[in-house]
């Protein structure tokens, strides 16, 4: 009896890149950037090391690809959540919840993004900072639309505070002291602190 060999499916370049990034996020998060090897990533994907270099050029290029994808995903989930809101309070609440839900459901990416000590000097750290800048600009734009009388400096200051508070609360949830705090609870804690001041500002302006 003659056996028929089923041809292996060929992945598109985009599909292969996604596979590589999925594996790289896991390996970098598990081992840290410096200890991780391209061999380990290639083995996890099931390809040869030259395939990784063909897609990303270097280990740092692979790291930057991981960070860039996380940046795009985070903006997508937070902007989609905010777009569903019907008022400013709901906009903040849904945005915060989307942020914490994303981190909870993408824990390897989260570990990678915030292991700053493992990132190489230069491009890697700059790319991580670009995520903060992206979220700050996004929040500032939302706030400016709701409080145009506040002015750009005040709105940017508010956005910096919000992004910093989100990041610090997320870091606290990684440790033992905050490990039992759910995404919903974290959202409520932020709203308790931040919405009071913003709501008062709206009341004073007659918004």
Where are these regions (language model features)?
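Amphipathic C-terminal alpha-helical segment
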Residues: 101-105, 109, 141, 159-180, ...
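Hydrophobic alpha-helical connector segments
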Residues: 65, 79-105, 150, 158-162, ...
């Amino acid at each position: 009896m003659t056996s028929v060999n089923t041809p292996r499916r060929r992945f598109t370049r985009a599909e292969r890149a996604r596979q590589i990034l999925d594996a790289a996020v896991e390996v970098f998060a598990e081992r840290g950037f410096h200890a991780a090897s391209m061999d380990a990533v290639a083995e996890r994907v099931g390809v040869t090391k030259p395939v990784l270099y063909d897609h990303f050029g270097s280990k740092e290029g692979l790291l930057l690809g991981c960070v860039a994808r996380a940046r795009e995903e985070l903006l997508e989930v937070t902007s989609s959540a905010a777009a569903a809101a019907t008022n400013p309070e709901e906009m903040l609440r849904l945005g915060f919840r989307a942020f914490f839900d994303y981190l909870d459901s993408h824990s390897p990416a989260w570990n990678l993004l915030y292991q700053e000590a493992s990132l190489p000097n230069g491009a890697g750290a700059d790319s991580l900072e670009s995520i903060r800048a992206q979220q700050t600009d996004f929040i500032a734009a939302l706030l400016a639309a709701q409080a145009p009388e506040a002015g750009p400096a005040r709105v940017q200051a508010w956005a910096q505070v919000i992004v910093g508070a989100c990041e610090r609360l997320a870091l606290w949830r990684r440790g033992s002291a905050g490990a039992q705090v759910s995404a919903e609870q974290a959202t409520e804690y932020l709203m308790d602190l931040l919405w009071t001041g913003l709501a008062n500002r709206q009341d004073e302006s007659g918004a």
